[in-house]
Amino acid sequence: DELVVNISGDGSFQMCQQELGTLKAYDLKVINCIFNNKNLGMVRQWQDLFYDKHYSHVDLKHGSPDFVLLAEAYGLRGHKPETRADVDEIIKTAIEDEAATVIDFPMAYEMNVWPIVPPGASNMDMMGVDNCTLTSKQRETPDFDWEQV
């Protein structure tokens, strides 16, 4: 009975897009928001930040499906905003609709995701969380209140 929203990049969505069949088979309403930058974004970002821009197998410009048509092939709803003005109406429609929905949000190819964990680092050493630095005492406290950050 709760609203369920899946936020995914286009690369990760393609790793489990067959689950659209599960949504249809069990009549589950999930709003799938795909942030589509036409590449394996986190892998590309790692290669950009840590491997001197030696890009390998991250470009999806010529190998991605039309996600709207893919949703419709499963009998689900599919939307792709063409302008910023379309976004609010599409989201409103998806929330009101009884069917599962795929929304393909176009993003800039170079757009990065923050925070990110550098290679070999722990989740406690994320980059891009300057305002969320934990003290060693907070790291040891299992019931740490993130509202204090």
Where do the model's predicted regions map?
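Thiamine diphosphate
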Residues: 1-149
